[in-house]
Amino acid sequence: MTDKINNLINQWLKWDKNEITRKEIEQLKENNNEKELLVRLEERIQFGTAGLRGAMRAGFSCMNDLTVTQASQGLCEYVIETIEQSKSKGIVIGYDGRHNSYIFAKITAATFKSKGFKVYLFSHIVPTPYVSFAVPNLKAAIGVMITASHNPKNDNGYKVYWETGCQINTPHDKGISKKIDENLEPWSNVDATSDIKYGNGDDGESMIDPLSVITELYNKNIKEYSVGSKIELANEPIVYTAMHGVGGVYAKKAFETFQLKPFIPVAQQIEPDAEFPTVTYPNPEEGKGALKLSIETAEANNSRLILANDPDADRLAVAEKLADGSWKVFNGNEIGVLLADWAWTNRSTLTKGGSTLENNKYFMINTAVSSAMLKTMSEKEGFIHQECLTGFKWIGNAAYNAINNNDGTTFLFGYEEAIGFQYGDVSFDKDGVRAAAIFAEFALSLYKKGSSVQDHLESMYKRYGYHISKNRYFFCYEPSKMVSIFNKIRNDGKYLTKLGDDDDEQFTITRIRDLTTGYDNGYPDCKARLPVSSSTQMITFYFKNGGIATLRGSGTEPKLKYYVEMIGEVKSNVESTLTKAVELVINQLLKPIENQLEPPKDD
């Protein structure tokens, strides 16, 4: 065993106080497993704009008591240095139902308490959106949510919200990361093992439980978005699944707030279960495989609508039984434009004072990998459309900044294709709880009129043109391979000029935007207008036929994602062109066999 590895082992054993993770490292040492020890100890888990996310096991590169302690110490010091009166403003801490989430939350709470912070620690598991909502409403300095969202059961994460209630963005991530590196040794005066004492938080020992206050205030705020008292709704059953996560009781409360008939829960998945026993991936975005029990429940209860939250309830999936008896799982773009249309129709409920402004005083946002249909809608209806980078750290901050510019504009809606939706400005992050209640009301209004969600989507396509997309991914477990694949596509700046056969002009590439290098030949100076990041891989190709294809490395999972969209007036033509485009993107750009990329198991 090398001196380097021995030094890393000794450092870990000096700092780690958890017997389970200490034994993991000791066992690896005893087995002389140098390779695994290097994987666990050589690199530190990186703190980025998404905070931390990784597998729960021993080692500096993983999620465990020690790395959460170190992250909390660094965050604490950064907040003290950056936000005035941060200790009296306090920190809000929430956690989901995963293994170790409560323990990690206690560590975070004890760390901040040791520095004299007021600590709001939820007494029960909560949806991620509750923390985003709670931070500004409690006038706190910072928020932390312990969750790995829809990741596999062995993962966990540490998500940070700024005092605005928005996810942190650059440069905060770099500042926090630097402070973590300066505070690696656990502070001696922190005790995270004692039982939590709740009180008013003023005695230097107790913590404040914000659960009842925030639950009441949150539902009071989202009630403003309900239009059920003004329109007729069908009396039809709706099936809901929490996907073994936290959403059940909170979605139930949101339905009650909207005065909707109680949903029918998927019994096997309504209670939190850290093992996620009924699904391979606890991710409703995976489609019919993840929604198998939901469909069975719906069939048994004569329901044609399924609403599904992911485990931390910040995202929403939707499925509907069609007239032919088959089930359609709507993708994120379809749900996004449907909710955008609902927000546009009911924009007075999203306007302060309940009045209606000029069309160009409203704005909506979606991400660069989401459908161009929202932009098409904006051009036809006259509202402002803004495009931003992938992730709600961009959408939330863009919405917050625009609202606080005081230029008379009103934010209506923002979404990303990965089934994340922000309806209104109750909070500035994606929220599957309020989205579920809002979508239920929308769907029931359609059913009352003899229509359906799919029928309404078709009517939107007739108005704005068919915008049909295919988004999928391959697993890419090695970061160096991800970079290599994208660099091969760049070909030292000599990008492909077309896809397909020489005599097929429709896939001639008319524009390339590379947000890793900052190149965008859609502008005279060939400089990208969206923010550029050399540490993330993302290239978009625009085709002569109006189609768009984006390739992107995920920031939170080992996935190389592709997003392809075709636009046109005739559905069958758009669908066939999309099928061909996806095939070309996979075979000519991604080259999964050559690059040894692993497809999803259900493909």
UniProtKB/Swiss-Prot annotation:
Keywords: Carbohydrate metabolism, Cytoplasm, Glucose metabolism, Isomerase, Magnesium, Metal-binding, Phosphoprotein
Residues reported to bind alpha-D-glucose 1,6-bisphosphate: R53, S149, D314, R315, T390, E416, K430
EC number: 5.4.2.2
Record field: catalytic activity: alpha-D-glucose 1-phosphate = alpha-D-glucose 6-phosphate; O-phospho-L-seryl-[protein] + alpha-D-glucose 1-phosphate = alpha-D-glucose 1,6-bisphosphate + L-seryl-[protein]; alpha-D-glucose 1,6-bisphosphate + L-seryl-[protein] = O-phospho-L-seryl-[protein] + alpha-D-glucose 6-phosphate
Main localisation: cytoplasm
Residues modified to Phosphoserine: S149
Subunit and partners: Monomer.
Family membership noted in the UniProt record: Belongs to the phosphohexose mutase family.
Record's protein name: Probable phosphoglucomutase-2
Gene name per UniProt: pgmB
